[in-house]
């Protein structure tokens, strides 16, 4: 069967029955028609429907990982056992995670990933949702294809063991950096909804400083939106807030600009962290060709060009932390290539 991005229910059913290892996105009523097997899935936006030669609608986005994976096990997790994600992973492998958008477990995972040590193996995935921030928004669900269970308050992870001669790694293509000419912000609560904030205005901007508290800093408590409006800070879907976690820039985008003083974010802010306004410093498409031959799976924000036709467009990109406005890519290479060859170029 030809490799393409979307397949019919019949075609995907055949793949599952042939023990293919699959990552799927579609509407929930479509995913509910599939048999159990080696797959995980998440709800997605409704795309324009195309048809195969048999006239069947191509409703399911498919990423087939069978070529590299010798075995899998699929688990679901709640906030009290996130630490088991690392424990359940294969020694030589990777894990694909999907999280229901704007659920309490989405919030909990954002906090957990920001406050725990680095994981020792690749975990990447996506925040699954459908028409989020619009009147057509559906309840966010993720699916454990091994059992057929649909979850609105659990994350689902497919742990994949690689064949012995392969190694997995990932990179993050992040086209944003902090705008040091603008103030920093702190928020009092871990939340998708922001209104009040503390503004940290520096009397002098120091080049190269990332998320450290500068000397001569004054703090102003105010409403975020009126402050942004008064200081010509754009508030729209492409506005990015940036903080630093374990030496890495992570990004948060605005999903909805509500009437009044509130904003709804695609990823929650974390109290105690300082957030900058982001500015674009490169064209992410320029990096898509770097190590492109080893990419087997990718996730991208709706506002980022797709690295490949099969890349999952998401409401959040997961690669250790949760990001917005980036692309994350999972690579598999022969072991010697990973050890002695070129390393991934990560733009962060």
In which residue ranges do the predicted regions lie?
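Hydrophobic alpha/beta core scaffold segments
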Residues: 1-348
């Amino acid at each position: 069967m030809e490799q393409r991005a979307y397949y019919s229910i019949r075609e995907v059913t055949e793949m599952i029955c042939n023990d293919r290892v699959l990552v799927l996105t579609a509407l929930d009523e479509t995913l509910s028609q599939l048999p159990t097997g080696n797959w995980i899935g998440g709800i997605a936006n409704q795309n324009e429907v195309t048809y195969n030669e048999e006239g069947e609608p191509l409703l399911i986005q498919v990423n087939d990982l069978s070529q590299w994976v010798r075995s899998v096990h699929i688990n679901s997790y709640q906030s009290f056992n996130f630490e088991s994600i690392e424990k359940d992973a294969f020694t030589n492998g990777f894990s694909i995670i999907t999280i229901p958008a704007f659920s309490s477990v989405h919030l909990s995972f954002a906090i957990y990933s920001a406050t725990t040590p680095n994981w020792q193996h690749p975990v990447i995935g996506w925040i699954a949702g459908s028409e989020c921030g619009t009147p057509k928004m559906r309840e966010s669900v993720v699916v454990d294809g091994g059992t057929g269970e649909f979850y609105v308050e659990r994350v689902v992870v497919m742990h994949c063991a690689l064949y012995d001669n392969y190694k997995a790694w990932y990179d993050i293509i992040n086209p944003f950096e902090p705008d040091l000419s603008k103030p920093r912000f702190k928020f009092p609560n871990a939340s998708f909804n922001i209104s009040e904030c503390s503004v940290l205005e520096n009397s002098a901007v120091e080049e190269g400083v990332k998320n450290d508290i500068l000397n001569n800093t004054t703090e102003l408590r105010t409403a975020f939106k009126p402050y942004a409006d008064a200081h010509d800070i754009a508030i729209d879907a492409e506005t990015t807030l940036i903080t630093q976690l374990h030496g890495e820039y992570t990004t948060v985008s605005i999903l909805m600009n509500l009437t009044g003083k509130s904003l709804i974010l695609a990823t929650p802010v974390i109290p105690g962290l300082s957030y900058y306004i982001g500015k674009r410093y490169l064209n992410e498409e320029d990096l898509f060709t770097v190590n492109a031959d080893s990419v087997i799976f990718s996730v991208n924000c709706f506002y980022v060009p797709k690295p490949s036709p099969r890349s999952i467009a998401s409401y959040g990109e997961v690669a250790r932390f949760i990001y917005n406005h980036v692309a994350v890519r999972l690579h598999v290479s022969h072991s010697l290539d990973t050890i002695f060859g070129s390393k991934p170029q990560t733009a962060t």
